[in-house]
């Protein structure tokens, strides 16, 4: 492995030095492209979870089912003489995001106009924070599998307007413009070029999504357009300066983003490897798009064709001043962050990393609480929680919206763990309680639905013939033995694999109320111990 030293060639100018030796990470070769290093930076545009737009009082119209141009103010449509009014809720959520990403809050920031002409921008400029953003110098740690945490620096966080939505009508050769989204609040979160693979880029976006959702700043749904990514990719020989970066615009899923980065690495590497002189060969600096059908990037424009945005301060918006008290109040109200949730689930409930990943991958999964003490092996709580999250996902509900309280969930888990009901019955009981909310406790519903487990052996390992459930289970086992004489003969001849057929019959007849291991032990005792009197 090779370490790139920042102090080499000290005679270089400072900008060149920063560009050339910004990488302090230890190089680890990727077998997919040996001898080459990949450098990736990401710009994410997260739609702020505010009911109102950033500079007007209109409702944020991001619901695709709503009719077009329903939530539009004169300012959103760029009527002459209209003035912006900053939404303080958007500012607070941007501060909350900056604190979660360990950024330096700028107590004085300002807004600029970014000029360009396009049909989805009525005013001809976008209000953003190019020169004095609301936050600088943050960090987000990402956890790759079988690796230590990778720190990714956040260059800046800035507030800006979203554009309108344009839809091309190819038959009429016109674009339909919907201004419902125009003026909605966005946060642009810009990372430093600290990522070294498509997988790291994907993990960065997933981790950022988890943070934004945990603090309530954004839905982070790429499929619905509330989180969009632009990536900058460059390739260089190991030990050489970073190559020319190419930007890939408007990636709307983690899968497509990783595919776009992979194709761009292969494309740039092919250009450099085909050159006769690697010292003088460079990749053309371009802005590129991504074809979701072919999984390839394509050229949009070159550096020479790039527009001059002519940034200038917005004269209608003054300096945004944030007091220490305001920032501290937001800091004090920060909820539990994903890495804190992960630590709590690991320490309090002894969950595995895989189970924690399942919980954190589902919206509101972090809100699940377990009543009582830890499981000995964690299996009971995990199985019921997986079932709960699956049912809520199918119903499109969150944990806080459903009628099942954490107290009742804890009691249900206890019923499974102490053997009162089987895991199969526990899942059935959970589905019943979600479908038919009731004030009855899980134990009462268990009796009502006759879900009590058919126990076969006590903790001492011997059956209890006086138990009603034992007698019922013994009757079911004897009935199965009587109905399957050929299988019984095979078991007595030493072929114990055939016993599974007998056990399966008992399980079906018990409707999931019997434990498979207990049934197998009881069937074996009845057959080999002479319990079959047929």
Curated annotation (Swiss-Prot):
Xref: PROSITE patterns: GATB
Name assigned to this protein: Glutamyl-tRNA(Gln) amidotransferase subunit B, mitochondrial
Domain of life: Eukaryota
Taxonomic classification: Eukaryota, Fungi, Dikarya, Basidiomycota, Agaricomycotina
UniProt keyword annotation of Protein transport present: no
Cellular component aspect of the GO annotation: glutamyl-tRNA(Gln) amidotransferase complex; mitochondrion
Pfam families documented for this protein: GatB_N (PF02934), GatB_Yqey (PF02637)
UniProt keyword Secreted, yes or no: no
Keyword annotations of the record: ATP-binding, Ligase, Mitochondrion, Nucleotide-binding, Protein biosynthesis, Transit peptide
GO molecular function: ATP binding; glutaminyl-tRNA synthase (glutamine-hydrolyzing) activity
Gene3D superfamilies hit by this protein: 1.10.10.410
Catalytic reaction equation(s): L-glutamyl-tRNA(Gln) + L-glutamine + ATP + H2O = L-glutaminyl-tRNA(Gln) + L-glutamate + ADP + phosphate + H(+)
